[in-house]
Structures are given as structure tokens and as C-alpha cells.
UniProtKB/Swiss-Prot annotation:
<dbReference type="GO" id="GO:0005886">
    <property type="term" value="C:plasma membrane"/>
</dbReference>
<dbReference type="Pfam" id="PF00306">
    <property type="entry name" value="ATP-synt_ab_C"/>
</dbReference>
<dbReference type="GO" id="GO:0005524">
    <property type="term" value="F:ATP binding"/>
</dbReference>
<dbReference type="InterPro" id="IPR000793">
    <property type="entry name" value="ATP_synth_asu_C"/>
</dbReference>
<comment type="similarity">
    <text>Belongs to the ATPase alpha/beta chains family.</text>
</comment>
<keyword id="KW-1278">Translocase</keyword>
<protein>
    <recommendedName>
        <fullName>ATP synthase subunit alpha</fullName>
        <ecNumber>7.1.2.2</ecNumber>
    </recommendedName>
</protein>
<keyword id="KW-0406">Ion transport</keyword>
<dbReference type="InterPro" id="IPR004100">
    <property type="entry name" value="ATPase_F1/V1/A1_a/bsu_N"/>
</dbReference>
<feature type="site" description="Required for activity">
    <location>
        <position position="374"/>
    </location>
</feature>
<dbReference type="GO" id="GO:0046933">
    <property type="term" value="F:proton-transporting ATP synthase activity, rotational mechanism"/>
</dbReference>
<dbReference type="InterPro" id="IPR038376">
    <property type="entry name" value="ATP_synth_asu_C_sf"/>
</dbReference>
<keyword id="KW-1003">Cell membrane</keyword>
<keyword id="KW-0547">Nucleotide-binding</keyword>
<dbReference type="InterPro" id="IPR023366">
    <property type="entry name" value="ATP_synth_asu-like_sf"/>
</dbReference>
<dbReference type="GO" id="GO:0043531">
    <property type="term" value="F:ADP binding"/>
</dbReference>
<dbReference type="InterPro" id="IPR036121">
    <property type="entry name" value="ATPase_F1/V1/A1_a/bsu_N_sf"/>
</dbReference>
Length: 545
């Protein structure tokens, strides 16, 4: 038997040297987990005991995942990418980071996915850093009251449902009622502010497309490019073909990009089109993660899903740079049911809502805004003084017209005042019609609404109202300084009113109706006063009631 050639002292010295050479700082440990099952954009992972909520983890094939459910024996993970290659038993590791996206002015004019990667084929994007998706909204003391106007260029909205910078204004209605059209018109209307070069006027726009058809997103981009609005707009696209996890994250990506500009003292407009599809995607993810369902199978925290997103829209205080982010979330209803779960949630979170009615849309009243139930809770303080002055009675007149119109269907004889009110209401309703992608500057809106509410259009046939408006504005641009004065002062002075009055009266002498007749020869309808017996009969009926 061979003898041991190493003495005990040598063994002891070798062990001692090895122990003394150990440096704790150079040692590293890595938590490793394994995939239990995967499918439908979700994976369940065993291991990783130290993982944090919303931490990024990496699968062996390089795919990223977002840790959501932290349970005793496993983790529920949203797969951020192609999940077909993730198999049972695959190794998973922690990154120690939360999900973030690159931000900066390089994103203007680009189309990106919910992870901030460009998908428009125009190369890489130069970024100015990264910003976490889950950011705390500004606190009460970090905010300032909404006081600056955010013009949409749509007469019905700017006059009666004004929006201010930093406001959250919901656009709600059935499918195919023009919700996206209002949002796109609002983006296009910011072009003049952008071209002014004044950073206090410029508005950077973000359009977040959630669950839309790819062709729809392409048409939106095409419309913005044609209008020259893409240079100050970013599109975050999560089409219908994306996994549910991407649709859930897309609004937070857009919000993170916008917050970077907001905290830099700039103004941002963000459109979420639409949050109904985000809620449905979150419901799908939650059910796959085996979270307990609640009302309409939505998880219990679906209100928090939208509140923490929309609370990031704010007007910041002067100490923080006075930037703002205005939110226009869109919600799609079914059969005009605004009392459903998600619509009522978002209505309670936002600062007002614009209701679009399918009946009005089908009656060719476009934009199909129902002014009776639409409201802006904070935008009135931000409204331009000139438009505020001329539109003071507009909403009331339209409401009275709607109620009188319903009554007139059953009434054969109406008194002169009622017939006059019906005629005025029909012309005001026609005046509020507006073609898509044609936003009106605020000074033109003031002239149009002033002419309508002051009775200047009462002699114009209803079918000629829009042509009269168009030709009147051309006449004012060419022959007077009324529009330039309104644009410069934003206040309706007595001198401007007198100038408008004379200019409109002069134009009415030149205008010809669709039948080729001068407007002066048409005249307004002569309303006969109600007969005495009719008045007495009406009083008898009221007395019996």
C-alpha cells in the first residue's frame, strides 16, 4: 500500500491559504428559476425567491418577462415578446431592474412598440435616457390649477365643452361614431402652435393605439403625415395581433414618454385609443394568472389600472417647470350604455366627458357630440375669453331646441316664438357640423358662433349655412382685420363687435342662396302671432293638467 506523500502540515497550510484568499466582494450568487408551464403570453416560474413585483426577468432564449404574481411556490410572469419558444424546464434569471422605456425628442415623428422599440423601419432612435413605466403621479402640492386652453379646433367642443392643458377629458361613444376623428383633429390643430416656435405654445402629441387593426393605425399615421402633424407626434402601437401583455403595457409606455417632456417644462397631449381594449387585455392576463375575477370577470384592481394611468396627466406647478400633460382617453360603449363597469370607472376618474351618439352620427350631425350630457368640469377656467363670451347662450339654446323639436313632432300649430326658436336651433345645429381633418382656428370659431347666436343667420336657408360660413370667413380674411384682431387680443371688444356686425351685414348683401337668389330677397319667415282663441284654449288645457 502506497504511503501518503503529503504531510498533514502541508494540507493544513494549503487549506489556510485557500481560506485566506477568499474575498467576499468578488463572490456572486445568481438566483435561477425554471419554467413550469407557458402559453397565451403567460408563464409560471418556480424559484427566484427574491424577485420583486414588476421586476424584469430573462428567459434562456433572451425573451424578457414581467413578474406579476408573487406566490409561495411560483411566480406568474407576463412574457414580453414571442412566447412560442418558451418551454417547460427552461432556465429563468433575475435582472434586478424594473421595466423602463427610452425617452427623448428622438421619438417625435416615430412609431414604436410598447417596449419603445421603433417599428417604422426608420432606424434606431436617439434617446435621452430611460424612464420607468410605473411612475408615481404628481402630488397635490406639485400641481397647479388648469388655466391654459387646449384648443381642439372643433366648434362644438371649444365653445361648449372646453378643454384645458393638464385636463383629462373622456371621449365616449359606440363604435363608428367619430371618437378617433376628434382625437386626430385635436392633434392636427396643434400644427400652428408647433410652427410658431414658441415653447410655451408648442404641444408634443402622443397617440397610443391599443388593440386597433393594423390598417387603422396605418391610416391614422397617413392622415397625420398628410396634415404635416407627424413631426410633433409619437405613435405607440399595440395592434390587435399583439399579445394581451403588450396591450396592457402600451398606455404606460406612452405616459412615460410624455412625462419626460412634462417634467422638462413642455406641454404634451396624449390620446389613449382606447382604454376599453386595455381593460379587456388586463382581464385576459389576470384570468390567465389565475387571479380571482370580480364584476364582469374583471379583476378587483381594474379601477386602479386606469386611475394610476390618468392621474399622471397634470398641470405642474411653476417650481417644477409648469409643464403639462393633457389626456384624452377613449372608451367604446355598447348600445350607448354608459352605465357599464369600465365606462363608469373612467367617467369618475376624468375631469369631464364628451358623449358621441350614434343617432346623431347617422343623422349626419358630425361630430356627433351630444351637448346635453357632455360636460367639462375644469376647462371653463381655461377657455379663451372671446369664445366664452359668444358661446354663453349656445348650450342653452341647443338644449331648448332639442326639447322643443321633440314636442313639435306631435304639435300641429306652434306659436311664433317656438317657430322662431326651432328655426334658430336648426341653423345652430347645422353650424356646428364640421368635416374631418378641418379644425377651425379659434378666431374663426368666434365669428361663426357669434353670427349664429346673434341671429345673423336667421335669413339664411339651412342647406346654405355651411357655405355661408365658409364664404363669410373668406370675405373677412380678404377685406377686414377682424380675424387678426381676434387672434391677437383673444378678447371680444365693442370695436371688434361693431366691425363684425358691419362686415357680416355687408356680406349678406352679396351672398346668393343655393337657388341663385340674393339673400336680401329671401327674407326671414314671417311668424303670425297666435290667435286669442288658441291662447285661451292652451290656458284651459294647462288648467286641466
Amino acid at each position: 500500500m502506497a504511503e501518503l506523500s503529503i504531510s498533514p502540515d502541508e494540507i493544513r497550510d494549503a487549506l489556510k491559504d485557500f481560506v485566506q484568499s477568499y474575498e467576499p466582494g468578488k463572490a456572486s450568487t445568481t438566483e435561477v428559476g425554471y419554467v413550469l408551464d407557458a402559453g397565451d403570453g403567460i408563464a409560471h416560474v418556480q424559484g427566484l425567491p427574491g424577485v420583486m413585483a414588476n421586476e424584469l426577468i430573462t428567459f434562456a432564449d433572451g425573451t424578457l418577462g414581467l413578474a406579476q404574481n408573487l406566490e409561495e411556490s411560483e411566480i406568474g410572469v407576463i412574457v414580453l415578446g414571442e412566447f412560442a419558444g418558451i418551454e417547460e424546464g427552461m432556465e429563468v434569471r433575475r435582472t434586478g431592474e424594473v421595466l423602463s422605456v427610452p425617452v427623448g425628442d428622438g421619438y417625435l415623428g416615430r412609431v414604436v412598440d410598447p417596449l419603445g422599440n421603433p417599428i417604422d423601419g426608420q432606424g434606431e432612435i436617439a434617446n435621452e435616457g430611460r424612464r420607468a413605466l410605473e411612475l408615481q403621479a404628481p402630488g397635490v402640492m406639485q400641481r397647479k390649477s388648469v388655466h391654459e386652453p387646449m384648443q381642439t379646433g372643433i366648434k362644438a367642443i371649444d365653445a361648449m365643452i372646453p378643454i384645458g392643458r393638464g385636463q383629462r377629458q373622456l371621449i365616449i361613444g359606440d363604435r363608428q361614431t367619430g371618437k378617433t376623428a376628434i382625437a386626430i383633429d385635436t392633434i392636427i390643430n396643434q400644427k400652428a402652435n408647433w410652427e410658431s416656435g414658441d415653447t410655451n405654445k408648442q404641444v408634443r402629441c402622443i397617440y397610443v393605439a391599443i388593440g386597433q387593426k393594423g390598417s387603422t393605425i396605418a391610416s391614422v399615421r397617413g392622415a397625420l403625415e398628410e396634415a404635416g402633424a407627424m413631426e410633433y407626434t409619437t405613435i405607440v402601437a399595440s395592434p390587435a395581433s399583439d399579445p394581451a401583455g403588450f396591450k396592457y403595457l402600451a398606455p404606460y409606455t406612452g405616459s412615460a414618454i410624455g412625462q419626460h417632456w412634462m417634467y422638462g417644462g413642455k406641454h404634451v397631449l396624449i390620446i389613449f385609443d382606447d382604454l376599453s381594449k386595455q381593460a379587456e387585455a388586463y382581464r385576459a392576463v389576470s384570468l390567465l394568472l389565475r387571479r380571482p375575477p370580480g364584476r364582469e370577470a374583471y379583476p378587483g384592481d381594474v379601477f386602479y389600472l386606469h386611475s394610476r394611468l390618468l392621474e399622471r396627466c397634470a398641470k405642474l406647478s411653476d417650481e417644477l417647470g409648469a409643464g403639462s400633460m393633457t389626456g384624452l382617453p377613449i372608451i367604446e360603449t355598447k348600445a350607448n350604455d354608459v352605465s357599464a363597469y369600465i365606462p363608469t370607472n373612467v367617467i369618475s376618474i376624468t375631469d369631464g366627458q364628451i358623449f358621441l351618439q350614434s343617432d346623431l352620427f347617422n343623422a349626419n350631425q358630425r361630430p356627433a357630440v351630444d351637448v346635453g350630457i357632455s360636460v367639462s368640469r375644469v376647462g371653463g377656467d381655461a377657455q379663451v375669453k372671446s369664445i366664452k363670451k359668444v358661446s354663453g347662450t349656445l348650450k342653452l339654446e341647443l338644449a331648448q331646441y332639442r326639447s322643443l323639436e321633440a314636442f313639435a313632432i306631435f304639435a300641429s300649430d306652434l306659436d311664433a316664438a317656438s317657430r322662431r326658436q326651432l328655426a334658430r336651433g336648426a341653423r345652430l345645429t347645422e353650424l356646428l357640423k364640421q368635416p374631418q381633418y378641418s379644425p377651425f382656428p379659434i378666431e374663426e370659431q368666434v365669428v361663426s358662433i357669434w353670427a349664429g347666436t346673434k341671429g345673423k343667420l336667421d335669413e339664411v336657408p339651412v342647406e346654405d349655412i355651411l357655405r355661408f360660413e365658409r364664404e363669410l370667413l373668406d370675405h373677412l380674411h380678404r377685406n377686414t382685420e377682424v380675424l387678426s384682431q381676434l387672434k391677437e387680443k383673444n378678447v371680444l371688444t365693442d370695436d371688434i363687435i361693431d366691425a363684425m356686425d358691419k362686415a357680416v351685414d355687408r356680406f349678406k348683401l352679396e351672398f346668393q342662396t343655393g337657388e341663385g337668389k340674393p339673400l336680401a330677397s329671401v327674407g326671414s319667415e314671417k311668424f303670425e302671432p297666435a290667435k286669442a282663441e288658441d291662447v285661451n284654449q292652451e290656458q284651459i288645457v294647462k288648467g286641466k293638467r
